[in-house]
Amino acid sequence: MAHARDYHRSNVRELFPIVVDAYRRLADRYDVVVLEGAGSPAEINLRASDIVNMRMAQAADAACLLVGDIDRGGVFAALLGTLALLRPHERARIRGFAINKFRGDLSLLTPGIAAMQRRLGLPSLGVVPWLNDIGLDEEDSVALDDAPRIAAGAWHAAQTDRSRALRVAVVALPYLANATDFAALAAEPSVDLAYAEAPADLERADVVILPGTKDTLGALRWLDGGMGDAVIAFAQRKPVIGICGGYQILGLTVADPHGVEAGGARSGLGLLPVRTVLTREKVTRAVRVYPRRFALFGREPHVSDEIQGTGYEIHMGQTTANSRLSAFADVVRGGVERVVDGAVSANGLIVGTYVHGLFADDPIRWAFVRAARARSGLHAPAQLAAYSAQREARFDRLAAHVRAQLDLQPLLAAAAGAAATRLPRRRSLPTRRRSLR
């Protein structure tokens, strides 16, 4: 089993060249490349193995913006401490600082900003006020912190109104991954989505989803505590969907002969006649999805041949199905390779797929909501969300908000290779592209 120390040691030796190659491919296609760091750029205990912050900035010869989150408190100390811990050649890349998520009277912040400019010798490029109801995807760990829990009382009251919301329970597996799979579904007016942490949480649900997980074998061990039996019982009468690791869990067995996770093998829930072998090679592909024509959840409306969508695969494992089992979809990888994905039980109640991001496509999500509501004896949805268009509008709103508050000219000038009006001129690059971090 791999340990954290081994992972960090392999970062620079094995992973960093791959990251640099990916950057170069982007630099060949775009005039500006934005590098997003992770955590702090000044974690001195991890400096030797950090490949996403200043090491990457050095490789791309990037102009950098240091951003502090004032909502966490202590923003001035964080900015000053970060600059103090950076090495001289790293500090030289910082073109300015900005403060994010500010709430309150900006005039109260102004003296601190002025003092920081004097002390750091760097300009403030602006303060971004807090933006309410941003409605955009967050990282898994962040998204789950505030996600609704069924145990918190979401569905304790009996609801017999056929116009009520469809209750979707996402099983809170250990090391849950790709929580953004459910953002579009949760945005539907006729859907109430929450996370299930105990077997009793499934009692009032209409649909159960087993999400992706970074540790399928560990999730199966956790399911042995009672949740697995609850899902099996639920599946006898109501729909269950498994995505990626959740799909593997629905099968007969998951084997790990190469020690990708913990090694060994475990029995799955046995709801689909498929078997999975975890592999060393990780599949990461954007795909186009063409769901097969079948009666979703055993009820009308059928999934039609005209419905299609996009998504992505990111998994370590090969799943083989019984030859008589119906596939969920045909998937096209890279625009050329056509493969079969997933599985559907004979009664249409159990669906498994490796494709993430399916619910973000309006036609696929709408088909799911309609079929699930019909299966649950609920009225057809009175309204369906145009999530794709709404998501683009939210990005535009955020971009306008940031653009109005930040002076990005110094960074853009550096990225374009031009002299910045208020900042030192940067040296020329041997390549024809510039980068921002």
Predicted feature locations:
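Flexible phosphate-sensing "switch/lid" loops adjacent to ATP/NTP-binding sites
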Residues: M1-A233, P239, D256, R280-V283, ...
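Gly/Ala-rich beta-loop-alpha elbow adjacent to hydrolase catalytic centers
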Residues: G242, G246
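Conserved catalytic-site region of short-chain dehydrogenase/reductase
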Residues: I249
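Class I SAM-dependent methyltransferase SAM-binding "motif I" and its flanking Rossmann-like core
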Residues: V254-K282, A286-R288
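Conserved AMP-binding/adenylate-forming
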Residues: Y290-R293
